Every structure is written in C-alpha cells, then in structure tokens.
C-alpha cells in the first residue's frame, strides 16, 4: 500500500483533504490566488448520480450576498445563508463541492482547470461573495471561453513550477485506478447551505 499522506490506516483515500492540499499548493504558487484564505473554505464531495463525463464536476457556493452582505433580497424576501463554522468557530465564506466519480474521471489537465475555475469565482475581496464581472454574465464575464483559457494558462503555469509530484500523480488517476491503488474514496460531505428568512 502506498505511503500517500491522504490514505488512512484503514486504507481509505481522503479526497477532500487531497483537494485542499492541491488548492493550498496552487495558492502558494499563483499570485492571482493570494487573496484566498483556505481556512475559511470548506471542501465537500457529492456522489454524482450517473457515471458520465457530462454534467457538473464541481461548484463553488458563496456564503454571503453581493458585496459580502450578510443578507439579500430573493424573490421579494430578505434572506440570509444558514452559516457554516470551522472547528474553531470561524465563519466559512465559501463551500467547494466536487462531484465524484465524475470529477475523478477527468484528465489531469481537466481536473486542474476545473479546480482553478472554481477558485477564480472567489471574490478578490474574499468577502463571501463571488468575483463579479461587468455585464449580464457577471459570473463568467461576457466570454466563458476566455475565462476557461485563463484557467488553462493558470494550470500550465502551476505545472511549470514543478509542484509536489505526488499531487500530480494522484491527479492523473481516474476513479477506478485511484481506488485500485489507494482504497475506497471518502471525504467530508456537506449539504448545500439553506437560505433562511432574516428575523
């Protein structure tokens, strides 16, 4: 059995711990991500219902509203997000979900672009809101293709800096090969936060 640090004594692979370590390494090497404080980002995995390459691979959920506001108007009602807390009681500002095995069955490059795509949604102010672009499509700008090209550039720059080879080795494995090598895939599972009325 491998000495991979994400494998527990009971021979299960901690996927969410691994994903956090990949993001930690990316933030350390890419100055565009320096604003992200990972201790206030929660990582979770969701079992994808169908084993297909189509569909959602990952999502980033902001825990606050526009501008970092603690509440906002939705369908005429003022709502807030049911809060998540870290183990030391700090407010979680973002929730990163990866859909397994769909995410795991992407190529290494596709995994990197997907992770960076979600991290880039985090506001430069790191205030619990999304990065907002001008225009109607404020989430991905007016050109989602340009957004994805930028993520590919980030991925290539990260790889060019020779990051931890064990991270790259695991990223190169699909779900079947990952389980064959390291054991059952486990991790934190956090439900999507609820919107609740203020007051």
Predicted regions and their residues:
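Short pre-active-site segment immediately N-terminal to the catalytic Zn-binding motif
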Residues: 97-114
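Short, well-structured alpha-helical patches and their helix-loop capping segments
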Residues: 107-111, 118, 139, 143, ...
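Generic "edge-of-domain/loop-turn" microfeature
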Residues: 50, 103-105, 121
């Amino acid at each position: 059995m491998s000495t991979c640090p994400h494998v527990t004594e009971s021979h299960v692979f901690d996927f969410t711990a691994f994903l956090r370590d990949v993001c930690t390494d990316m933030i350390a090497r890419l100055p565009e991500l320096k604003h992200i404080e990972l201790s206030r980002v929660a990582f979770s995995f969701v079992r994808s219902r169908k084993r297909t390459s189509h569909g959602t691979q990952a999502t980033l959920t902001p825990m606050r509203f526009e501008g970092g506001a603690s509440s906002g108007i939705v369908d005429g009602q003022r709502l807030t997000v049911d809060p998540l807390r870290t183990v030391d009681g700090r407010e979680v500002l973002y929730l990163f979900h990866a859909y397994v095995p769909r995410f795991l069955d992407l190529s290494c490059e596709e995994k990197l672009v997907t992770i960076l795509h979600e991290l880039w949604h985090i506001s430069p102010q790191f205030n619990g809101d999304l990065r907002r672009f001008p225009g109607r499509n404020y989430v991905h700008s007016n050109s989602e293709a340009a957004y994805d090209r930028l993520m590919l550039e980030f991925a290539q720059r990260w790889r060019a800096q020779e990051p931890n080879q064990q991270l790259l080795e695991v990223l190169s494995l699909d779900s079947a090969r990952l389980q064959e090598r390291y054991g059952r895939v486990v991790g934190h599972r956090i439900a999507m936060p609820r919107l609740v009325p203020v007051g």
